[in-house]
C-alpha cells in the first residue's frame, strides 16, 4: 500500500525489493484567459465559505468576493508567467519542463468530469478536453501524467466506475498496486476528498468482491485517496484504496 502526504514514498521491506521513491506534483488544468478561452477561468474564482464554523465566522465578510484579474488573482502568489491559460501548449511545455527539472516523476492532472455531462468544478469549468494536451506535454518533457479526480455532486461508486472507463483510455502514468511482488502496472488515479463518501460505497468499486469491482478488469487502477485528517485512514483500508 502507498502512503501519501503530497509526495509518494515507498520503503523496501526486503533487500531484494528496492522501490524507487516517487514524487508526484498536483497540476491544475482549470485556468483560462480571455485571449485563449474567451473569458477568465478560475483566476476570478469567488471566495468560498470555510469548512469550519470558527474560521468561517472570522472571514464571512469576504464570502462571494470575486477576484479581478489580471491585477488581483485567485492565487497565493502571482505567477511568473502572469495569468495563463491551461490549454496553451507552449505554457504546458514550459511548466512540465520545470517539473522535470525539479525531479518530479509525474504531474497529477485535475479532472472535473466526463465530456458531455453536467459535471464540472464549482466554477463551472470542465478540464476533460485539456487532459490530452497535458499528457502530450508531459511526454515531451519526459515525465508521467496521472489523474486527480475532483469531487462533484453525486460522485459515488457508480459514477466513478464510468469515470475510470473513460480515463483509462488515456496513456496515464502507471505503477503496480503493490510495490513488491511483480504486480501489473496500472494507471494512477487520485480521488480528491474521498472522505465525502462512505468506505462501504468505495468498497463496491475497489474491493475484489465489490458488486462494481474494477479489480482485474481493463478499468483497474492504482487508486489513492486524499484525506484531511489522520483519523480518516480507516477509509483507505475499508474502501480498498491502494494508498
Please annotate each region the language model reported:
Residues 16-243:
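Glycan-processing catalytic domains of CAZymes
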Residues 2-15:
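Cleavable N-terminal signal peptides of Sec/SRP-targeted secreted and luminal proteins
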Amino acid at each position: 500500500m502507498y502512503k501519501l502526504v503530497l509526495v509518494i514514498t515507498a520503503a523496501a521491506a526486503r533487500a531484494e525489493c528496492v522501490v524507487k521513491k516517487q514524487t508526484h506534483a498536483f497540476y491544475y488544468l482549470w485556468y483560462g484567459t480571455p485571449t485563449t478561452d474567451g473569458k477568465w477561468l478560475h483566476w476570478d474564482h469567488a471566495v468560498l465559505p470555510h469548512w469550519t464554523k470558527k474560521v468561517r465566522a472570522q472571514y464571512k465578510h469576504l464570502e462571494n468576493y470575486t477576484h479581478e484579474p489580471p491585477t488581483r488573482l485567485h492565487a497565493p502568489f502571482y505567477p511568473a508567467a502572469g495569468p495563463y491559460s491551461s490549454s496553451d501548449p507552449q505554457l504546458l511545455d514550459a511548466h512540465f519542463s520545470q517539473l522535470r527539472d525539479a525531479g518530479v516523476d509525474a504531474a497529477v492532472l485535475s479532472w472535473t468530469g466526463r465530456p458531455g455531462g453536467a459535471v464540472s468544478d464549482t466554477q463551472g469549468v470542465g478540464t476533460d478536453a485539456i487532459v490530452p494536451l497535458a499528457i502530450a506535454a508531459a511526454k515531451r518533457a519526459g515525465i508521467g501524467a496521472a489523474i486527480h479526480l475532483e469531487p462533484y455532486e453525486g460522485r459515488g461508486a457508480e459514477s466513478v466506475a464510468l469515470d475510470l472507463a473513460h480515463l483509462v483510455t488515456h496513456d496515464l502514468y502507471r505503477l503496480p498496486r503493490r510495490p513488491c511482488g511483480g504486480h501489473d502496472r496500472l494507471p494512477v488515479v487520485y480521488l480528491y476528498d474521498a472522505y465525502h463518501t462512505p468506505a462501504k460505497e468505495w468498497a463496491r468499486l475497489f474491493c475484489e468482491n465489490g458488486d462494481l469491482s474494477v479489480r482485474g478488469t481493463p478499468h483497474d487502477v492504482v487508486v489513492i485517496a486524499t484525506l484531511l485528517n489522520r483519523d480518516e485512514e480507516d477509509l483507505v483500508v475499508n474502501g480498498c484504496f491502494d494508498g
